[in-house]
């Protein structure tokens, strides 16, 4: 039974596509083709500085590493755009702690 659940998690994560809406300042993932979506919100707080503020995954989809995909996309955006970032969101703080890549760490403002 546990093995089936593990396969299900992997199947879901391989089908995820993160969309970046720069106008609305959010990363999102549509979940199973439904209207449900997971989001990561950010704001510019300076010309080259963003505040990664909030990550939300609908309760029915939690525990499937969906937020991890959003956090990675957001941190990759920070790197690609050569930005600095405040990590207000606790989940992104956790993600960076678990994935302490130098290109992420050098862009975090404390």
From Swiss-Prot:
* InterPro entries for this protein: Acyl_CoA_acyltransferase, Gcn5-rel_NAT, GNAT_YJDJ
Top-level taxon:
Eukaryota
PROSITE patterns reported in the protein's UniProt record: GNAT_YJDJ
Where does the N-acetyltransferase domain lie?
Answer: 19-109
Q: Gene3D superfamilies in the record, alphabetically?
A: 3.40.630.30
A Pfam family in this protein?
Answer: Acetyltransf_CG
Q: Which family does it belong to?
A: Belongs to the NATD1 family.
Query: What is the protein name stated in its UniProt record?
Result: Protein NATD1
